[in-house]
């Protein structure tokens, strides 16, 4: 695995890696909706969205999504790095695991609904950053 991955960790016995991936997808879902809302706010209040991304990229809001996908959202570049339809699948798995653990994550459920709406509009093969089209 070290041949194709920079960050390799054993998180426990079989199945724990899957749960770790779900944690990643849950956090990413929150980052994506926050990024979309932040960029919408920037735009509606007259800020330059690209300058705003550059400004906050070194602060507490910094994330891989902000740095890599924020500019693509602003430029309306929805070429896939990770397909919407695949992200929906992961979010569905995460929600199923939440249900099995008696855990309610309303933000996760809401973000999944936005992505499902995007897919219903023909965006299933777009990149996850195309979420900006839904709001």
Residues covered by each model-derived region:
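Acidic-glycine-rich active-site phosphate/pyrophosphate-binding loop
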Residues: 1-14, 64-70
